């Protein structure tokens, strides 16, 4: 059974579970800064709170500042830190992950390393372990992450909601659809660095439609559209997520993103249309 920390690590409720078989720290970026801190080092220190004495930790590729914090925390607890390396990334790529996105190869490599560490000492044949890992990576699904809801007209949804996530999405779109431009539909929380998120998307954008997600923390769609227009890109706000399917353009690609709240609403619209 796998438990995911909801926020940070040091004060997260998952710490009440006792000692796991393995702890895993994925790539650290700027998010929840009002709680976790304003620098990568501060955020990494909070994430390092899941590292426990006697429990090995797997660490995904990190910025050097974050990696140094995590390795010091592991050393202080006297545990081994298995850092995902380039050869792990290449092995994961060869397994053909079922999830779209260049960043999913990194996630797959991290999951592969975590499984190997968790099974260390277990009576599992090496070849069987390889088969199970390969099958899991190939069959993995992740609703709301580069998920294609419609192929014609094309609509992809992605729950990326911070600048790191948007950058990963942009890189993946450039790899999957080189030289293409996109219509973006965007809804964000007001406490996110949405200006940096917009900046990541501008080079790939034909235009934007903005919405106000159903959350007390939501940024008003018109405010977001106004900020985008200041960058010289067409943008207008709509009041209902249910309008989005009617806005799609044949033979062109639309990407909806910016908030898991918004993506959840849009997925519900499509499920109700089925």
Question: Where are the language model's segments positioned?
Answer:
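Short amphipathic alpha-helical segments
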Residues: 12-16, 36-38, 70-71, 168-170, ...
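Generic C-terminal helix-cap and adjacent flexible tail
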Residues: 121-124, 268-274
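A glycine-rich beta-strand to alpha-helix segment
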Residues: 243-271
